[in-house]
Amino acid sequence: MACHLHHTHLFASDISKSIQFYTEFFGGQVVMDLKMAGSRNVFLSVGRGKLHFYDQAPKNPVRGNIHHIGIQTDNLEEMVNKLTARGVPLKKGITDFGFWKYTTVLAPDNVLIELFQVDKTQLSKEQTAYFDLDNP
């Protein structure tokens, strides 16, 4: 089971302004722009790095605008079984959007981690590259 750090997901009180900032100054490219989990989500590629944005203001001013760290795995069910077998509770069960399925867990210090798996058969060539699915 392979895993790698994939992205940081940020709240954006003005998502258009955030997108413009990262594209104009850092050469970011919008790879996906869609509605997931009730909000507009925009996935940006910035060089080899990745940023995801929620179209909503930060919910907790103490935590700032970082929502979660995304860790991609090639076998979400196996990862979930490994975590739960060792007593790490899931925040909720697996959510499946067809091309993307995920769950969340809390790491030490209450860092929210999104564990996710994507199905490259449902993605474009650019999206497959974004998720590094041809280079595990």
Predicted features and spans:
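N-terminal beta-strand motif that seeds the catalytic metal site of vicinal oxygen chelate
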Residues: 1-16, 67-69, 119-136
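Core segments of cupin and vicinal oxygen chelate
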Residues: 2, 9-51
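Vicinal oxygen chelate
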Residues: 4-13, 42-45, 60-136, ...
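Short, positively charged
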Residues: 20-24, 80-86, 128
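A short beta-turn/loop motif at secondary-structure boundaries
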Residues: 34-37, 59-61, 95-98
